[in-house]
């Protein structure tokens, strides 16, 4: 099982300081729909793991979130891709749950659901907490510089998990993965 987990806000869609609260505010990052399509066509299972504390803070509802995800699914399919599952944590930090990144609960659940190997699983995110969550299970962290990525690199570059790879965008990450898949494997 080849699994790639994507954070949502700042990776797939544009992030907002005041939370993405509605389908109208959910705007894809340029190239992200094509990136998911490329990963799908390269044989990867693509899942989304997203902290959505705006639900816990009562900024938007699960229904609003469902509408945003329906739009994301539709646009990804139009590009020729597939998102195989979406996991979200509705809690705030104060709830001290195990599913909110950087804790690994959501990531462990996704890896278990798809019967994947953690050591072979990528997580692409724009925040330190995304990278810490995949690192906690022994996976492969990738930082994109969209969303909060540039700020993460400048403020937390020294804290990034070892072996974190940095890409400008999700599209750049997908092209890297496709090149890796095309490279001849050593015996």
From Swiss-Prot:
The record marks 100 as: Contributes to substrate recognition. The active site is at residues 7, 9. Pathway: Nucleotide-sugar biosynthesis; ADP-L-glycero-beta-D-manno-heptose biosynthesis; ADP-L-glycero-beta-D-manno-heptose from D-glycero-beta-D-manno-heptose 7-phosphate: step 2/4; Bacterial outer membrane biogenesis; LOS core biosynthesis. Its cofactor is Mg(2+); Zn(2+). It is found in: Cytoplasm. Pfam families: Hydrolase. GO terms for biological process: ADP-L-glycero-beta-D-manno-heptose biosynthetic process; carbohydrate metabolic process. One of its GO terms (cellular component) is cytoplasm. Substrate binds at residues 7-9, 15-19, 50-53, 100-101. Zn(2+) binds at residues 89, 91, 97, 99. Keywords: Carbohydrate metabolism, Cytoplasm, Hydrolase, Magnesium, Metal-binding, Zinc. Mg(2+) binds at residues 7, 9, 126. One of its GO terms (molecular function) is zinc ion binding. Its EC number is 3.1.3.82. It catalyses: D-glycero-beta-D-manno-heptose 1,7-bisphosphate + H2O = D-glycero-beta-D-manno-heptose 1-phosphate + phosphate. The record marks 50, 101 as: Stabilizes the phosphoryl group. Disulfide bonds: none annotated. The keyword Magnesium applies. It comes from the Bacteria. Monomer. Belongs to the GmhB family. This is D-glycero-beta-D-manno-heptose-1,7-bisphosphate 7-phosphatase. It comes from Neisseria meningitidis serogroup A / serotype 4A (strain DSM 15465 / Z2491).
